[in-house]
């Protein structure tokens, strides 16, 4: 079959019309130094701060130092296979992590990659790890409570949705236990929790995840783990990655709780990177921008205005102190950024007061306006009572004679300390907290032996659940106290039963005092 000349010319014309002159331009540099999680590269004159760069082995890095001759890069992943002379190219993107519902119930690394062995995470949504915090007009005052389930916190230092509340204390004072109990208490509260573990042993994180699974809390929780064995760059970006995951929910009108455990280790990782990148050291060898490191992170937690959906992100950053020194650099920085702090005292912890919240040093600057009416009524004077008890307790060490009023204050104080104790992984619903604190502040516990207080509390809840469930229901629905007469009658009913069955109205402590006086 002969080919016609017209057909050939038509084909050529069509190809010319469809021809596109596409030039693929890549800016490629050369690695001049690599080691300890950082690299330097020459030839990336147009690289931008925070830009994602790709190495020839497939690893990624983030541009940090933009110098006249080279670029300082932190390597996000395996740096041992990168060699001097390797190529590194610009991507024109900033670092992003996968976000969305697919991450709920999973354990991921700071790059959003699954590390729990449950398969791939299928999501098409991504968010940049660094983002602008909401402005003043995009925010709303904190007005909803975020219940932790811990009496010592919900009564003395209440937290609201959208607040930043620092948890600070020495190692082994129960900071992580507060985090886990708070997550457990969010069950059924329409809250998504993100637990960011920074610089912890993988075995410790595994234990926490098992606890969350046991109580059904992984159904609404994402765990981001940057373990102690990970390179410093991953510890540095972990909190930002967790916050980006939380922002996806917050900007869609949902409520998020994010816990950073802990920011001291992130600051140490950032100090390591800064010193390796030859940035000038400042106080305690931290770089000059270590305040900005934490402020730009924590400012992203907010209660959004109704125009933006009314979502919220509540942040609980943890900071570890050395020998209770809260005047060190990182603790003072984070105290000044947050809306209050919960100080955990090691002496209280070892004395058996757990959670070991120091009522004198702990404060919540905005949470009071989010407390429910019932809690405000019963816990209003609790902090002052506790502070005056601690003061009086110090004086009684001298063994001076006490008048009846002082003795009554001491007795009430001992019972207050006892009632604020709580078992591990046993968060209390707010209505139950209100009832037991009401019983305390209205003198129902004054004749109960101190060593029987927690037994009385547990059995009182069982009695009310069975015989007066409407009391709990009223507090839960109205957020206010039921009729005082009804509440007094119910508590007195059970108190009479308790004292009759125990057949003892004096504690061991009171008996010893009577022997000494005799």
Curated annotation (Swiss-Prot):
Keyword annotations of the record: ATP synthesis, ATP-binding, Cell membrane, CF(1), Hydrogen ion transport, Ion transport, Membrane, Nucleotide-binding, Translocase, Transport
Quaternary data: F-type ATPases have 2 components, CF(1) - the catalytic core - and CF(0) - the membrane proton channel. CF(1) has five subunits: alpha(3), beta(3), gamma(1), delta(1), epsilon(1). CF(0) has three main subunits: a(1), b(2) and c(9-12). The alpha and beta chains form an alternating ring which encloses part of the gamma chain. CF(1) is attached to CF(0) by a central stalk formed by the gamma and epsilon chains, while a peripheral stalk is formed by the delta and b chains.
NCBIfam families according to UniProt: atpA, PRK13343.1
Binding site for ATP: 169-176
Cellular localization per UniProt: Cell membrane
GO cellular-component term (any): plasma membrane
Predominant localisation class: membrane
SUPFAM superfamilies, A to Z: C-terminal domain of alpha and beta subunits of F1 ATP synthase, N-terminal domain of alpha and beta subunits of F1 ATP synthase, P-loop containing nucleoside triphosphate hydrolases
Species this protein is from: Enterococcus hirae (strain ATCC 9790 / DSM 20160 / JCM 8729 / LMG 6399 / NBRC 3181 / NCIMB 6459 / NCDO 1258 / NCTC 12367 / WDCM 00089 / R)
The keyword Cell membrane belongs to this UniProt entry's keyword annotation: yes
Top class in the EC scheme: translocase
Reactions catalysed: ATP + H2O + 4 H(+)(in) = ADP + phosphate + 5 H(+)(out)
Family indicated by similarity: Belongs to the ATPase alpha/beta chains family.
Purpose of the protein: Produces ATP from ADP in the presence of a proton gradient across the membrane. The alpha chain is a regulatory subunit.
Protein name: ATP synthase subunit alpha
């Amino acid at each position: 079959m002969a080919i016609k000349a017209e057909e050939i010319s038509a084909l050529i014309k069509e190809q010319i019309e469809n021809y596109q002159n596409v030039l693929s331009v890549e800016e490629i540099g050369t690695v001049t130094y690599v080691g300890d999680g950082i690299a330097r590269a020459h030839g990336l004159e147009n690289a931008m701060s925070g830009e994602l760069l790709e190495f020839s082995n497939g690893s990624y890095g983030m541009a940090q130092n933009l110098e006249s001759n080279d670029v300082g890069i932190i390597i996000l992943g395996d740096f041992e296979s990168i060699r001097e002379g390797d190529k590194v190219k610009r991507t024109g993107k900033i670092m992003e992590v996968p976000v969305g519902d697919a991450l709920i119930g999973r354990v991921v690394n700071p790059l959003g990659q699954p590390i729990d062995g449950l398969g791939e995470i299928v999501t098409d949504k991504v968010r940049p790890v660094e983002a602008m915090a909401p402005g003043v007009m995009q925010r709303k005052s904190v007005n909803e409570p975020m219940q932790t389930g811990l009496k010592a916190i919900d009564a003395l230092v209440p937290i609201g949705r959208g607040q930043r509340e620092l948890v600070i204390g020495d190692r082994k004072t129960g900071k992580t236990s507060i985090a886990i109990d708070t997550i457990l208490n969010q069950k059924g509260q329409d809250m998504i929790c993100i637990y960011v573990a920074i610089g912890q042993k993988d075995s410790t994180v595994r234990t926490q995840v098992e606890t969350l699974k046991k109580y059904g809390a992984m159904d609404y929780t994402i765990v981001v783990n940057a373990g102690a064995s990970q390179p410093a760059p991953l510890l540095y970006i972990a909190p930002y990655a967790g916050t980006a995951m939380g922002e996806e929910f917050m900007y869609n009108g949902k409520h998020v709780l994010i816990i950073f455990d802990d920011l001291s280790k992130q600051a140490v990782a950032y100090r390591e990177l800064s010193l390796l990148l030859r940035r000038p050291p400042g106080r305690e060898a931290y770089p000059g921008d270590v305040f900005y490191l934490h402020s730009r992170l924590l400012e992203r937690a907010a209660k959004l205005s109704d125009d933006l959906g009314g979502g919220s992100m509540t942040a609980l950053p943890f900071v570890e102190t050395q020998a209770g020194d809260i005047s060190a650099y990182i603790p003072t920085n984070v105290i000044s950024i947050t809306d209050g702090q919960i100080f955990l005292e090691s002496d209280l912890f070892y004395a058996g007061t757990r959670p070991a919240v120091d009522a004198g040093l702990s404060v919540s600057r905005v949470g009071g306006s989010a407390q429910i009416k019932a809690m405000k009524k019963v816990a209003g004077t609790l902090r002052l009572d506790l502070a005056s008890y601690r003061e009086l307790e110090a004086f009684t060490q001298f063994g001076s004679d006490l008048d009846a009023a002082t003795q009554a204050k001491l007795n009430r104080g001992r019972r207050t300390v006892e009632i604020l104790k709580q078992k591990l992984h046993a968060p209390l619903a707010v209505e139950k907290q209100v009832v037991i604190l009401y019983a305390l502040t209205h003198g129902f516990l004054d004749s109960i032996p101190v060593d029987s207080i927690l037994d009385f509390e547990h059995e009182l809840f069982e009695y009310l659940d069975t015989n007066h469930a409407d009391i709990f229901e009223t507090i839960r629905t109205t957020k206010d106290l039921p009729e005082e007469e009804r509440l007094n009658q119910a508590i007195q009913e059970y108190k009479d039963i308790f004292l009759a069955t125990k057949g003892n109205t004096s504690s061991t402590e009171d008996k010893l005092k009577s022997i000494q006086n005799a």
